[in-house]
Amino acid sequence: MVNFTIDQIRAIMDRRENIRNMSVIAHVDHGKTTLSDSLIQRAGIIADKVSGDMRYMSCRADEQERGITIKSSSVSLHFEMPKEDKLPAGCTSHEFLINLIDSPGHVDFSSEVTAALRVTDGALVVIDCVEGVCVQTETVLRQAVAERIKPVLFVNKVDRFLLELQLNTEEAYLSFRRAIESVNVIVGNTEDKEFGDVTVSPEKGTVAFGSGLHGWGFTLGRFAKLYAAKFGVPEDKLMGRLWGDSYFDATAKKWTSNPQSADGKALPRAFCQFVLEPIYQLTRAIVDEDAVKLEKMMKTLQITLAPEDAEIKGKQLVKAVMRKFLPAADAILSMIVTHLPSPLVAQKYRCANLYEGPMDDECAVAIQKCDPNGPLMMYVSKMVPTSDKGRFYAFGRVFSGIIRTGQKVRIMGVNYVPGKKDDLFLKSIQRTVLMMGRKTEQIEDCPCGNIVGLVGVDQFLVKSGTITTSEVAHNIRVMKFSVSPVVRVAVEPKNPSDLPKLVEGLKRLAKSDPCVLCYSEESGEHIVAGAGELHLEICLKDLAEDHAGIEIKTTDPVVSFRESVSEESSIMCLSKSPNKHNRLFMKASPISMELQDLIEAGSDISSKDDPKARANYLADNHEWDKNDAMNIWSFGPEGNGANLLVNVTKGVQYLNEIKDSFVGAFQWATKEGVVCDENMRGIRFNLYDVTLHTDAIHRGGGQIIPTARRVLYAAELTASPTLLEPIYLVEITAPENAIGGIYSVLNRRRGIVIGEERRIGSPLFSVKAHLPVLESFGFTADLRSHTAGQAFPQCVFDHWASIGVVNKDKKATEVALATRKRKGLAPEIPDLDKFHEKL
């Protein structure tokens, strides 16, 4: 069954130009896991018979039951390229190692996709040809391009065109073309010079078509090969002719771009005539049971069926014949090997995105060259639970050097700063393993460019981190998730004596999922926060069954809010220190929505930028005063949030002495706003004037920190404080007769429809709407009951929107008071007099 050994795989691991690291990404239910089956079966890991139904990559019981992927899982495939195929540039051997990661398509788990993308260099994007590009396809594609990952495309479920919708060849072509165009629109609008052009097109060979369930697929190269001999035209020339507006005029025996022949007849498009027509004919012959025609075609195409397939009929026979004619795995694996980059190529342009340190230190140079003799640099992107309760494999990618069993390494957590001792551990690796879907295989060592699991480092890392042997190494950048944990529940054990188990379980849960947040409130509640309802449900199930192993009670889901302001402070706020010797003057004003999003994305502007470059950027693009922009003291909360502390004072003595205390107070205040203890977002605090005591002893941290916090709160309260709630972008696919039901459900839940369009070539409509997360609980069930189960919603976190001004608008005030009550704070929103003082 397995036709390669671990030693063979280990041998290829050293040939970096023959390695391909790739992930399979797509919208939910577009057939990633089923397609991965065909590829794994080609490598001989599972038997031919069960391929397509087995879902080898779904390792968990609940994944098998629900039929969705929840965690990404990885497998290493050994692929031998056919001898007659042209080898990619720089390769000398026909044997390749493909590390394939199957990732979830459901939007709630897109943090799993991010973790998978970080350790790979290429992505196989799967699209359902009937549904086209959906919300989640768009999200993951954007993420892939941002991580500088090269896509190739597989248009899946073509069998539905033949057997279910019965479209003619021209309609099928138009449908394919539209799907490919929408992918190119998403990946094409990046202006990344080093990364180059990443658009996909069939004539380049970066698009394959087929059916994952039936196990057949092809690229244009396959047909170009068939016809090259017949027409006497070289293959690569023919590939360009088999797509787009090119037609073959049989009477004049020449190619033309004119859809009419010399004598005025309409010509069929080359793609329809030479590629789709044979497939349609073959399928039709089987479905109509036309044995004579079938035999003749099979003879021409040199297809011979196995003896045991002689008796089958109908769809099963279609599957058997098409698999022999166009095996999917061969087409896709050669596309991956030919068009996706090896670590050697990819790390050159990915290094700048990955590494936080300077681009000329030893680690950066080793990463760019993918150098096995350089210092070890490995990024751990997630933790994978082992069969041994409570222990995890650290799953990641080696970017340079070699990692060995028993090697002493430096384990650096997310908060590690070079030169300091925090979040740094010196430990040795217990074992290195190869991840093979449901199993793991032990290996001695693993050279750079490969994906590997480690045993024995899980106690030192929370979710992700960097492992290195170099003393000067900086961290590899933290991943940016497209979803944020906005839905929270409080958990408690049914039996109070189980509390220690719950706490231990929460720690393990936080490790096992890249996106989940576990923390305790001051009121003593334990909170679990997730990206959405489904994500939370899976996390709680894991917590009860695996991580804690106890029965738990949960509260209703609650939503996180953000506090913001809507105008500049109405008065200059003043606070005096407890000893009355120091005075701080401050105002607050809102930051534009656009700038808030940029800061949170961390791409164009972040706290780590060079202050001068940042000031120029703000002055040119966001109409900031250059002097103000130079004097940004801090971003908050956590040192990177979307609130700014700006020093606009003129000629104040001793100001630098209190800067650290002030920044500390700012981080504290922005983490717990005054309205209801939620994070602040989008507030710019301007420090106008400071009067300090001349004696250093009277202006220590104990005097400044509480005063600064009070003046920050006063500034927020005088600037019309608002509450922001998270909003989902919902995409709903449904037939026409269900549209009415969708609208009524959305209206009841404060949803706003922003667009509806018909999917060409299919009977489905797609409706896009904005829906407050607060109203989204039970939305799916409600929607299904109103549309007789025909509507499928997908929710993805989109933006923050204001509910209204606190103490003016009824809704905002109610929400604020309810949140205060839930957190056990004083029932009323504090008065301004508590914070603002008279001169």
Curated annotation (Swiss-Prot):
Give the record's PTM text.
Answer: Phosphorylation by EF-2 kinase completely inactivates EF-2.
The cellular location(s) given in this protein's UniProt record come to: Cytoplasm
What are its GO cellular component terms?
cytoplasm; cytosol; extracellular matrix; phagocytic vesicle; ribonucleoprotein complex
Main location as per UniProt: cytoplasm
The UniProt record lists the EC number as 3.6.5.-
Q: What class of enzyme is it?
A: hydrolase
Task: Tell me the SUPFAM superfamilies matching this sequence.
Answer: EF-G C-terminal domain-like, P-loop containing nucleoside triphosphate hydrolases, Ribosomal protein S5 domain 2-like, Translation proteins
Query: What stretch or stretches form a coiled coil here?
Result: none
Q: What is this protein called?
A: Elongation factor 2
Q: Gene symbol?
A: efbA
